[in-house]
Amino acid sequence: MEKILFINASEYDSGNTSRLGHENLNGIDYDQLNLVDYKIFQLGQHFDDDQFEEVISKMKIADTWVICTPVYWHNMSGRLKVWLDRMSEYPHSMWYGKKLVLGVQGMEPSDTIGPMRHLMKRFCDLNQMEFLGEATTNRKIKGLNHGLKKLD
């Protein structure tokens, strides 16, 4: 049985982005990680109270990550960007074989989804992960949900 981790990159733990993740994972057993609940400092900053290792420990035990972000100024949230930057501190081989789904939520994410899809596919390629797809609409969510249920 696959272990699925929903990574919510919104400032709200139960807002529209969280709902997108919940719809994508409807009927599937998963854990939720809200990036807003952790102190994650910028790449290059070193503080004793940084909690990125706690995030990493949850990610290590998951087989599939469902990452959802709101669109702010035609791009991913700052939390997701910091998460991506910090991921570069870890060996790519740590994530070998894991799977990733991207959820993008916003009023009009169409101009954002292409560059974000490219970025996440590149991230998956570098880390030897499998990119399962992205969702911005209910129809797309239903298709990804069906695929995730096969993993569960």
Role assignments for model-derived ranges:
Residues Y96-A135:
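Short, glycine-/small-residue-rich phosphate/pyrophosphate-handling segment
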